[in-house]
Amino acid sequence: MTDRQTDRQTDRQTVIKLCQYVFGFVNVKLSEIATVSRGGSFQKKDFCDEGVPCIHYGQIYTRYGISATKTIQFISEDIAKTQKKAVTNDIVMAVTSENVEDVCKCVAWLGEEDAAVSGHTAIIHHNQNAKFLSYFFHSSLFFAQKKRLAHGVKVIEVTPDKLLNVVIPLPSVEEQERIVDILDRFDTLCSDLSSGLPAEIEARQKQYEYYRDKLLTFTAKE
């Protein structure tokens, strides 16, 4: 990054913080707070019992939640040398799926080690609260945008570069932390009810989704 690019980035962050102070939040494009890159190329056949932590796009749909500090699988150090990595606080997003509902499912990587990331993914490197962004990417606010970005018939895809145009209502980092704390409690409560009656589970899940979307919707200060 050149000195001029660094100055522009600093100016942009200053404007964002000023708007957050005045209005309580600011609508920003993902490109203003993050960079997006594609994942690597390892496959399931490369999995091993120990080695370098790795996140495979297929497991983001089925095995991961909002965030993770440990991976489910590993790959060897030799294979990992040529792979793309997610560092702590990055968002790893699966950008292909069989349906619009599941495409762009993501996980905030909070592990201490870098994690190798498979293909069919986007690695979002940013300067915000990772879990806040992960919750946003699971919300109806994002769903409406990704429907416009998605393309394909049998395989639905969102091109990683197009994610940069996603608009996010962004409060201050302190407010992001407060929202994450509340949503984490809801998430834990829903998980604790996972062995209950189906109707009860569904009702609590809908309640959780409602409050999640409300917490991620902002109005300007008067």
Where are these regions (language model features)?
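A short glycine-rich beta-alpha junction/loop motif
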Residues: 114-120, 151-172
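A short beta-sheet element
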Residues: 56, 81-140
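Short ILV/T-rich hydrophobic faces within alpha-helical DNA-binding bundles, principally
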Residues: 2-10
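Short, solvent-exposed loop/turn positions at domain surfaces
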Residues: 19, 24, 41-42, 79-80, ...
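Short, structured motif recognition centered on aromatic/hydrophobic residues
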Residues: 25-30, 52, 86, 90-92, ...
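Sequence-specific dsDNA recognition surfaces
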Residues: 33-43, 59-90
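Non-catalytic DNA-recognition/assembly elements of restriction-modification systems
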Residues: 8, 19-39, 200-206, 211
